[in-house]
Amino acid sequence: VTAATTKFSKRNSGQFAKLGDVCVRAAGAVPGNVILFFPSYTVMEEVHKQIHGKITKELLKEHPNMSKEEKQKLLKEFKNTHLAGGVLLAVIGGSFSEGIDLPGTLLNGVIIVGLPLGQPDLETKELIRYYDTRFSRGWDYGYVFPAFTKALQSAGRCIRSETDRGVIVFVDERYAWESYYRCFPSDMTPKMTEFYEEAIKEFFRKKEPQSHNL
């Protein structure tokens, strides 16, 4: 879905409103549980302001510096909402983006909001320089690919076995750019569409045990 972006230079109230609208519509079209993954807590909080009160499902949210017990409690609460449907807001690269198991109908959809491309820190800059010197592709190997891998790992929470079925929605105009689109693995070919709500509903009307990427 290319209707909005989390690109730092374009962040403003209008952009967050667009992101919120996509999240409300996409999450509402998925029956049962959905996880919204964000590139940072800052973006998550801004979008939360936009969707609070507009999503009929129960909203749960990851917080910075949560203890192991708090994370386990939040995960249990999320699992318990799967019949009526719940929406968990979490951060790409955080505890809920890796190492959790939500098989079957415990998770029917994942929405990746934006790309986790922050300001390069010293370590990242060193990696960029190293890969530039060695392969002349420092920006790709040291910055873009690691961020994209984190986004894909978060998306992978939705499909953990051959019998799982669910929808993965990538929300950001940059996913359509050639420089980023080529980062998707060969077995994942997202479809660009403005009509994502209907595409999601149509997927769940069918019975094929596979994932659908938007």
Where do the PLM segments sit?
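ASCE RecA-like P-loop NTPase motor cores
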Residues: 1-214
